[in-house]
Amino acid sequence: MTDIFSAIQRTAIRIKDAIDTKDIGYSQQENSSGETQLQLDIKCDMIIEEEFSHVTSIHTIASEEKEREVILHKDGRYFIAYDPLDGSSLIDVNLSVGSIFGIYEGAFGAKNMVASCYVVFGPRVEMVFAHNKTKLHLLQGKEFEFVKEIRLNEKGKLNAPGGTQQNWKPYHKKMVDSFFNEGYRLRYSGGMVPDLHQILLKGGGLFSYPSTSDKPDGKLRKLFEVFPFAFIFNRAGGEAIDGAVDLMNLEYAHIHDTSPCFFGSKYEIQRVREVYASNQ
């Protein structure tokens, strides 16, 4: 696991340099979702694959930018699914973006996840790595230094509601509004990594990306985004569900499979359970 952690640190340093200097214009290529890729998406994907290719413990990688997984080392034991640059469309307005890594042992799947990591590229570069605990690291020069363990409070203060509001179900909108009526503050940038990072570092709250009329199975991908953050929130004392079921109990049909998802402190997630149970 140490070799993987070190490789992720190297990718973070190289991606930071790419963000600072790389052309962010559109390429002529499309990713697995049919979206035109930015030059920076392609560059970051190449950086990660290159660094992981040197780690013999990694058997297979799957990138959010590619249709199929890639076998690196047949004798490896770890399978890594990653989003090279989540929120890359925010680069041109200079908002924070991030990389997400789900580390699985033996095969992909939530029940095989053994560690998870994400990197935030903002005014500072920070890395959160979850194995037995959820730990924050800060890039200082060319080295990451441990800062602290992250623990969520029982109840938070932030509300980050995703998805187009006109496509929300009425009871979901009512629930979101109820948190604001309790004094919760809106924190939503359109980037999953910085929004969830803020909830983790500020002690708690709720991030939601529900089933909507245009995306009934949710938008966020299980292997690349949903499972990794569910693992992190669970290790930090929070919870993560699809509206009813613990996200870490979900299966996946293919590597780009999606799910509705809710991440937060115990208080907020219990509210989600109650609201969704009474509206099924």
Curated annotation (Swiss-Prot):
Sequence positions that bind substrate: D86, G87, S88, S89, Y188, K219
Subcellular location: Cytoplasm
E.C. number: 3.1.3.11
Any one GO cellular component localisation term in the record: cytosol
Sites where the protein binds Mg(2+) 2: D83, D86, E225
GO BP annotations listed: fructose 1,6-bisphosphate metabolic process; fructose 6-phosphate metabolic process; fructose metabolic process; gluconeogenesis; sucrose biosynthetic process
Pfam annotation, one family: FBPase_C
Protein keywords: Carbohydrate metabolism, Cytoplasm, Hydrolase, Magnesium, Metal-binding
Binding residue positions for Mg(2+) 1: E64, D83, L85
Reaction equations catalysed: beta-D-fructose 1,6-bisphosphate + H2O = beta-D-fructose 6-phosphate + phosphate
Protein name: Fructose-1,6-bisphosphatase class 1
Record-linked SUPFAM superfamilies: Carbohydrate phosphatase
Pathway: Carbohydrate biosynthesis; gluconeogenesis
UniProt cofactor note: Binds 2 magnesium ions per subunit.
Family: Belongs to the FBPase class 1 family.
GO molecular function (one): magnesium ion binding
Subunit text: Homotetramer.
Swiss-Prot/TrEMBL cofactor(s): Mg(2+)
NCBIfam families reported in the protein's UniProt record: PRK09293.2-5
